[in-house]
Amino acid sequence: MIVQLTGTLVSVTPSVAVLDVNGVGYELGISASTAAALPQAGEAGVTVLTRMVVREDSMELFGFASREERALFDRLRAISGV
C-alpha cells in the first residue's frame, strides 16, 4: 500500500493534485481543505499522505494533508454503502 508520496507538486485544483515523484506523475483525489493546505504548483519536496483504494474496476489514490483527515477517510470507508 502507498501511504505517502514526496515530490514536486505539478498542479492543484479543489479536487485533484498531481505530484511528480522521480518522473512519475501521481494523480491524487483530494478534499478542498487539503487543496488549501498544499503549497503552490512547482514546489519541490512536498509530502502528501495517501490512501490507495482498489475496487473491482478501478484503482484510485487519495491524498491528505493530515493524519486526522486520512483517519476520517478510513472511518467513512468502513461504513457499508459509503
Task: Write out the residue ranges for each language-model feature.
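Extended, charged alpha/beta regions that create polyanion-binding interfaces
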Residues: 1
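Long, highly charged, low-complexity intrinsically disordered interaction regions
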Residues: 4-6, 13-82
